[in-house]
Amino acid sequence: TNNFPEFTGRLCPAPCETACVVGINVDPVTIKQVELRTIEEAFGANIVAPQIPDRLTGKTIAVIGSGPAGLAAAQQLTRAGHTVAVYERAEKIGGLLRYGIPEFKMEKNIIDRRLAQMEQEGTRFRPGVNVGVDITGSQLRSKYDAIVLAVGATQWRDLPVPGRELKGIYQAMEFLPWGNKQALGEVENPPINVAGKHVVILGGGDTGADCLGTSVRQGAASVTQLEIMPRPTEERPSGQPWPT
């Protein structure tokens, strides 16, 4: 049921483990670790073979966006026998997986390994094509039998607070892609670089943690992280025995 357990096994916060009823009495099932270990053992044993369809349907499909949703859709449609092309405006396929998730959380060769399998199955990739600019929707509709929109959310949430307009304040998705490109050797001096600077991160979730790790690796002088929620306890609270 999961096309890419090697991605989710590394990146998913595993709410299923928090909700696992086994956790009432003992430690919950380590679903995330089981998933990751299984797929890595399979890749290591070279048994993750491409699933090439027995016959083609003759239908052509364009998938716009090469993040996890677009790649999953493309793989399923290719395996069903359709001819699928994935369009991505960035120079490399992967979307948020490649340019949003830091290298220290998931190495990019993990993505490339899966893309190689998808290419063997028949999926075609069209990086560096900005749909709506380089090619119109009408052109795609005339070329393909169906189009899947998997462009993701490109509008971030902002904080309308005094001083927001000041210099040196960035959104996470302005900062992280440049950090990824620097780690990959695509740029030497990214336009947003916190080396030697004092950094304040607003937000204590996964994205905030990614910004923290990237800032430390760029050589920030200090990093302070602010979170609106209280610090969670080390153990399950006595008044909350049931998993959530």
Map each language-model feature to its residues.
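C-type cytochrome heme c attachment motif
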Residues: 14, 18-19, 85
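Ferredoxin-type iron-sulfur electron-transfer modules in oxidoreductases and energy-metabolism complexes
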Residues: 1-10, 14, 22-55, 179-180
